[in-house]
Regions:
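N-terminal glycine-rich phosphate-binding loop for ADP-containing cofactors
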Residues: 1-231
Length: 231
């Protein structure tokens, strides 16, 4: 998600969305930490994320999304060159500045102008998961970043993990997601995701295909059981 989000975020910026709006979309509306995408990079460190991306590029097979999106866009590469890694260097995508009277201002590093500017507050018209299916630029961003991540996860069983629970727990415990990908899809409604993918002419990821071919509507049932990769 972090790498896909960075590239899809760039596309959104090119279409007119602000970085603050990208952060607002890629946060609590889709069940992710309230920090948002860019602030999460600042927290982890751009230098750390760049190393992870290079590791993806070296070790993942051709065609894997981690390999495709692992390299930073040009503006973020420039930030690395400038030593602009995030909170630990005093600023990455954002920073706090101090005025003479002791008050503080938050500034955003504008990826288009590559200059610092005052941070602005953004309020979304849709502030929940339904944004995934909205035709607005914000909805397109949510679907292309988060929806793509959900579909990517649906292809990882059984190649990376033996079951869907392992992936869900990894994302909830390791990355503070409110729900892992499969629990999230259950909340959204797998049939809605399947319908959207089909309307776009896309092939269903493995676990969504297994679900569609089964007699079940969700990945989990009310007995604490989950769909296996064999159905």
């Amino acid at each position: 998600f972090m790498f896909i989000g960075l590239h899809k975020g760039k596309e959104a910026l090119d279409k007119g969305l602000s970085q603050e709006r990208v952060d607002a979309v890629l946060s609590t509306p889709i069940g992710l930490p309230s920090t948002g995408l860019y602030s999460l990079y600042d927290l982890i460190g751009l230098d750390v994320m760049e190393m992870i991306g290079k590791n993806f590029a070296s070790n993942l097979p051709d065609g894997d999304l981690g390999k495709e999106y692992g390299e930073f866009p040009e503006a973020e590469k420039g930030m690395i060159v400038n030593g602009q890694f995030g909170r630990k260097t005093g600023g990455g995508f954002s920073r706090m500045t101090k005025n003479e009277d002791g008050s503080r201002n938050k500034e955003t590093f504008d990826l288009l102008s590559r200059n610092w500017r005052p941070t602005k507050e953004e309020v979304l018209d849709i502030n929940d998961i339904s944004i995934l299916f909205d035709d607005s630029p914000e909805g397109v961003l949510a679907w292309e970043a988060y929806g793509t991540t959900l579909c990517y996860a649906a292809n990882l069983v059984p190649t990376i993990a033996d079951d869907i629970v392992s992936i869900d727990r990894a994302m909830q415990w390791g990355f503070n997601w409110s729900n892992g990908p499969f629990k999230a899809m259950d909340e959204i409604g797998p049939s809605k995701i399947i319908e959207k993918l089909k309307s776009e002419g896309k092939e269903l990821p493995h676990m969504l295909k297994i679900l569609e071919e089964s007699s079940y509507e969700n990945f989990y049932n009310n007995k604490g059981q989950q769909l296996s990769h064999s159905g």
